[in-house]
C-alpha cells in the first residue's frame, strides 16, 4: 500500500484539484432559426453553420 512521504500543503492540494471543476458545455445560436445547440453539432432543425445539412420530418 502506498504511503505518502510528506504531507501535501493546502496550496499544493488546491493546485492538484484545479482541473476537477465542472464546466457548462459550450453552446451556439443558429443564425437561421435562433435555436441554441452544442458547438460543432447539428441543430434540432438540421442546420449547421447556417446551411441545411439534414432533412427533418417537418421538411417532408
Swiss-Prot record:
Basic residues bias: where? 49-60
Cellular component annotations (GO), alphabetically ordered? large ribosomal subunit
UniProt entry tagged with the keyword Ribonucleoprotein: yes
Q: Name one GO molecular function term.
A: structural constituent of ribosome
**InterPro entries hit by this protein:** Ribosomal_bL32 (IPR002677), Ribosomal_bL32_bact (IPR044957), Ribosomal_zn-bd (IPR011332)
Q: What's a Pfam family in this record? A: Ribosomal_L32p
> Which residue ranges does the record annotate as region Disordered?
1-60
One GO BP annotation is: translation
The protein's UniProt keywords, in alphabetical order, are: Ribonucleoprotein, Ribosomal protein
Entry's family note: Belongs to the bacterial ribosomal protein bL32 family.
Under the heading HAMAP family, the entry gives: Ribosomal_bL32
Kindly provide the name given to this protein in its UniProt entry. Large ribosomal subunit protein bL32
Name the source organism.
Answer: Bordetella pertussis (strain Tohama I / ATCC BAA-589 / NCTC 13251)
